[in-house]
Amino acid sequence: MTTLLIVAHAPLASALQAVAQHVYPDCRQGVHALDVPASWPPDEVERRLRAQIAAMGGGDVLILVDVFGATPCKAAQAVTAGRPRTRLVAGVNVPMLWRSVCYAECTLDELAERALAGGQGGVLPVAGAPSDSGPTVVGP
């Protein structure tokens, strides 16, 4: 089973972890969070991220970060470089997280692909009031 680690600007990581555990209570051991406060310099983020991954036992880890190019992402890129049992996906959202929790038994590469698909599929324009037939999607 792949362990999930959410790394994001504080308090987003722990908030997303709480959402995952609210909907999937059995995932408590498999979803971890690292909130990055504005006061941490980049080297501190990287140090804490390395320590958290080490404490998770050395298995496969899918890291979900909030924004590509931001400090949490750069730290995760540095930590995952040369570490074959980690994958990194940027742009975490709730659909991505839920998909990751549901498919944590997949291989690491397959899970990263499913996480990306879940995140992308969960972003769509919606118009109008809710209905029993589903959302009204606005599109081309």
Which role does the model predict for each range below?
Residues 1-140:
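N-terminal loops that bind phosphate or other acidic moieties
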